[in-house]
A protein has these predicted regions:
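Catalytic PLP-binding core of fold-type I/II PLP enzymes
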Residues: 1-14
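Conserved PLP-binding catalytic core of the aspartate aminotransferase-like
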Residues: 126-168
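Active-site C-terminal subdomain of aminotransferase-like
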Residues: 12-16, 21-122, 128, 143
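C-terminal, well-structured subdomains that either form a transmembrane helix-short loop-helix hairpin
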Residues: 30, 107-108, 118, 127, ...
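PLP-dependent enzyme catalytic core of the Aspartate aminotransferase-like
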Residues: 147, 185-237
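A glycine-rich phosphate-binding loop feature that marks nucleotide/adenosyl-phosphate handling sites
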Residues: 5-6, 61-63, 106-109, 128-138, ...
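Generic non-transmembrane alpha-helical segments
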Residues: 113, 117-121, 163-172, 214-225
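Conserved PLP cofactor-binding pocket of PLP-dependent enzymes
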Residues: 167-190
């Protein structure tokens, strides 16, 4: 099985489809149209090489269609069908493979440009080079920039990025989500990371720069409130 819920549309891009080499060997593939195919929420698909594989996830409800019923209809993961497939069909009629390829290429290129801007600034730490159009990074408070980071320092940075993400969301001018995971260079310690998703086809570099500028501005304010300016050793108590 291949979970291609997010990355599946990469196949439409001649430039990037090599990232999914081998997917044709899968027995089943999941794909969410409401992500990179830009159609309404709930357009999820399970693609099966052999249709009878659907029988392995079959469930009969005793109050509806039973095995002895005359007409069981088509097997499906949905009960009442909202016809979301029409959204997908309309999008393909409008954009086609070439249109989706242009969107995929542009978004993946934007993610790489954002990664370059992050990597070039001492106040940010890029966790890894983006493969598609998702990237994770974190903002480093001024007193820890350019220093070797141990577990205690990472705990300070975690608290700093939680506060930063909340402040940016509350301000309402720009937004990224946050996540938590271990990064190999820091061992098994969970790190709080900022998570950017480059999906809107109308995003330009000026928007990306504006988002990062917002984080720098808010980060400076938060650092002055969160950390002791005289010792710079940890959160103010």
């Amino acid at each position: 099985h291949v979970d291609a819920a997010w990355g599946g549309p990469t196949l439409f891009s001649p430039r990037y489809q090599g990232l999914l080499d081998g997917i044709a060997q899968a027995d089943t593939v999941t794909l969410d149209g409401h992500k990179q195919l830009l159609v309404p929420l709930g357009t999820g698909m399970l693609l099966c090489r052999q249709p009878d594989l659907m029988m392995t996830v079959k469930r009969e409800a005793p109050y509806a269609i039973r095995a002895s019923s005359f007409d069981q209809g088509r097997f499906t993961l949905e009960g009442t069908r909202p016809a979301n497939a029409l959204y997908l069909d309309a999008a393909f009629q409008l954009l086609g493979q070439q249109g989706y390829a242009q969107l995929i290429d542009a978004n993946y290129d934007r993610a790489r440009r954002m990664a370059e801007l992050i990597d070039a600034h001492p106040a940010f730490e890029l966790m890894s080079a983006p493969v598609m159009n998702l990237l994770s990074y974190r903002c480093i408070p001024p007193h820890l920039q350019g220093k070797a980071l141990d577990e205690a320092a990472n705990e300070q940075i975690n608290a700093f990025n939680v506060a930063l993400q909340k402040a940016q969301r509350a301000e309402g001018h720009s937004f990224v989500s946050r996540t938590q995971r271990a990064v190999s260079r820091y061992g098994t310690q969970p790190l709080t990371l900022l998570r950017a998703v480059l999906l809107n086809p109308l995003i330009e570099e000026r928007h990306i720069r504006g988002l990062l500028d917002d984080q720098l501005r808010l980060g400076s304010l938060i650092a002055s409130q969160l950390f002791d300016p005289t010792q710079q050793q940890g959160p103010v108590v």
